[in-house]
Amino acid sequence: MQETSLTKAVSPRQSLGQILLNYYQLTKPRLIVLFLITTAAGMWVAARGEVDPVLALITLLTGAMAAGSANTINCLYDRDIDYIMERTRHRPLPSGRVQPWEALVFAIALAVGAFSLQTLCANLLSACLEMAGIAVYVGVYTHWLKRSSTQNIVIGGAAGAIPPLVGWAAVTGELSWAAWVLFAIIFIWTPPHFWPLAMLIQEDYAKVNVPMMPVVDGDRPTAWQIFGYTLVLLPTTLLLVYPLHACGLIYGAIALVLGVVFIRKAWELVQTPEDKDQARAVFKFSILYMMILCAAMGIDSLPLTHAVVSQVTANLQTLVGTIL
């Protein structure tokens, strides 16, 4: 094969540290952090706040490995368009610091390691869910939809919604309705999280013919879609409180406040869809939203929290009884 910018040999002068950094960058570690947060939330809610620390550590480790595998394959598949876009052309594959076959071997090793370790230390269901996440992200999003549909991030977003299922299955060995609500929360959250970012970098997507919604439909229709998803997201988060009773009032109150703020910010974007600062504000808040929401799930699930809430409730009932 004729040598191109995408098939140049890796420089023999790279230090061990640079080589390790290359593979670390292939995994897109900043994306993995959010996956691990939602995995932990699933575990803590499923276990009512009493999670085996060893199981938690292993599940988070294998989750990071599985996500790293999926992200590496994504980098491998997209290396042609990454080379064209200025913000991505210096990544390990388009820059030639890592060869395609090396990235593929690395991705396979991560996937095999994740599946084996999770099966041995947790259970087969959670391990299979990790592999399903890889399959959906690579097959459905990266290969099928990313370059062909404006709904790429909506349908492909199912991959990012799988981590809480992994966490839940690791603890219980099954998937309850509450687990699927966690899946739905992440699934519905993904478009209003990603589309504001797509609005900011739509010129890059247009350059490489990736049909992200802002590129094809424009900023205003995209802003309305973002607003619509935030409206659906708020009641979905509250399903964990009622009727499922998987989370309590502390989580419910925080989810309500977060949801209202998210809706307000999305509405402000509808008013000024061409305002890049507003799109950036929605994107940044979406990350904060998910981090606080998952933290609220974890705190609400703790036995200490249940004890405090029960005691406060009992005291209030006694006070009301005394007054009446």
From Swiss-Prot:
Pfam family, one: UbiA
Gene Ontology molecular function: protoheme IX farnesyltransferase activity
Topology class, membrane: Multi-pass membrane protein
Pathway named in the protein's UniProt entry: Porphyrin-containing compound metabolism; heme O biosynthesis; heme O from protoheme: step 1/1
Catalyzed reactions per annotation: heme b + (2E,6E)-farnesyl diphosphate + H2O = Fe(II)-heme o + diphosphate
Keywords tagged on the record: Cell inner membrane, Cell membrane, Heme biosynthesis, Membrane, Transferase, Transmembrane, Transmembrane helix
Subcellular location field: Cell inner membrane
Chief localization: membrane
A GO term from the CC aspect: plasma membrane
Highest taxon of the lineage: Bacteria
GO-annotated biological processes: heme O biosynthetic process
Disulfide cross-links: none
Residues annotated as transmembrane: 31-51, 53-73, 104-124, 125-145, 153-173, 181-201, 222-242, 243-263, 285-305
EC number from the UniProt entry: 2.5.1.141
PROSITE patterns (alphabetical): UBIA (PS00943)
InterPro entries reported in the protein's UniProt record: Protohaem_IX_farnesylTrfase, UbiA_prenyltransferase, UbiA_prenylTrfase_CS, UbiA_sf
Note: Carbon 2 of the heme B porphyrin ring is defined according to the Fischer nomenclature.
Family: Belongs to the UbiA prenyltransferase family. Protoheme IX farnesyltransferase subfamily.
Summary of the function given for this chain in its UniProt record: Converts heme B (protoheme IX) to heme O by substitution of the vinyl group on carbon 2 of heme B porphyrin ring with a hydroxyethyl farnesyl side group.
Protein's name in the database: Protoheme IX farnesyltransferase
Organism the protein comes from: Cyanothece sp. (strain PCC 7425 / ATCC 29141)
